[in-house]
Amino acid sequence: MRIKNKKPYYLKRKTVIVDNEGGKYPGYLEEPIQIKANIAPASGKLQAEIYGERLNYILNMLYDENEVMTEGDGICVYVPKESKPDYKIISIKRYSHLVIELEKLLWV
């Protein structure tokens, strides 16, 4: 992957947040981790068949560095690193680099 095509983004790990009443709900850690990746809109016949109308909310991320990511982690794509992530990882495919599919979080 060409270095000049990579841009900085911020990864926020998923976690379980416990409120003061003992309720548990999913959330993201506050400390962002900077990564460099290439992100582009999803396209193609296969992804159109898989996601249908959700395709407008899907991005493809190409990543070839060492930071470990899991499905459900958040990525700050169009928001600053201090805010909640606007995309989450829904699929990780391992080739010579990682092809990661991101889906827009609509609660942002």
Each language-model region and where it sits:
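Short, conserved turn/kink motifs that form compact alpha/beta structural patches or helix kinks used as
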Residues: Y25-V108
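Extended boundary segments
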Residues: M1-A40
